[in-house]
């Protein structure tokens, strides 16, 4: 009699357990198809390779097709075969974050890669919604980055999101290292997405240095890692930055690069059956990018200032990823290969760069000085060919004469060695001295 009373509950328990299990039926490229278990999009699953040795690969539900789950693994698919059991954990990917992550190098799911141990912390979701627009504080304070050309002419505010646009080999990573060492932000969170393995240690030891690493967290997903890890690394870094923002900190989030995050999303989208749209990018790329970028910015507690490098394909500044990023971000710093060839570093093209919040956070005097410097650059650039071939005669145009007189001092102000550091007030004083006459 008692057994009969509890039979329906026993059956329910068995049904619930077995609904959490499924079986691999197909593997094509990056995608694993399974029949069952019951799951939702972004649920985390275990694909059991050897139950006796407790050997399993973690995977995420990235889509559905004909009543089958489409899974993408966080690791290589070696060892996974048809018939492997799939277990649903029942929750999406979350990461353990806390003050213990500072000074560490982590992979895309917050596992230390430097041999360290992270203690304590709380779990933050990797996939999170941006703050409510009405809860965001208005950007009203300058965030000094310690680079004269940026602080003086493309001034960045706390909570701003700005892109660093450049082709390959023009100095994006070096500039990020200068920002990380010189910034006045409380915490640096650095995401190296799709980088060459050789460059990771170089960036940490040469560009970032011991001084920068003390208050930094570095999240690394090199180019050989699966697309899902590269994609999640960008979101994991953002989740870590969100944790520190919620503690009332001013965080500088630096991501190198947004382009490789988009390429990883392209791999995931195409493998899930999305159609290619513009230059092979599926629609999800254009929805995932704003979701990622909007998570940075101010909140009612602290701020995340986002610096995102964008690798400009073939130096074409109108290609889809570059154009989309530029339309979402609050400004852009353009690095010029032409300036790099002249040994002008950082190779920032001031006339092509803009900070959309500078007018609201800089003083009137600062804005006037920045405008005068840009006028000198613009005037000289227009007349440069005539000057170089000797066709321009001094005295023909007062503005050109003034630009010729000032151009060397202007270029000296715009150049900066990687080991040089300036306080914000020093930078403004140097800008004033340019135009004292």
Each PLM stretch: what is its role?
Residues 20, 41, 101, 120-122, ...:
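A generic structural signal for well-ordered coil/turn residues at beta-strand boundaries
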Residues 84-86, 100, 113-160, 173-178, ...:
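P-loop NTPase nucleotide-binding/switch module
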Residues 152-153, 159-437:
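P-loop NTPase catalytic core
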Residues 26-28, 36, 49-51, 63, ...:
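Flexible glycine-/small-residue-rich
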Residues 1-104, 109-113:
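N-terminal accessory targeting/assembly segments
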Residues 54-55, 93-97, 112-117, 134-140, ...:
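Active-site phosphate-binding and catalytic loops of NTP-dependent enzymes
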Residues 4-9, 89, 145-150, 237, ...:
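Phosphate-interacting basic helix/loop segments used at nucleotide- and nucleic-acid interfaces
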Residues 16, 53, 141-148, 171, ...:
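Short secondary-structure boundary/capping elements
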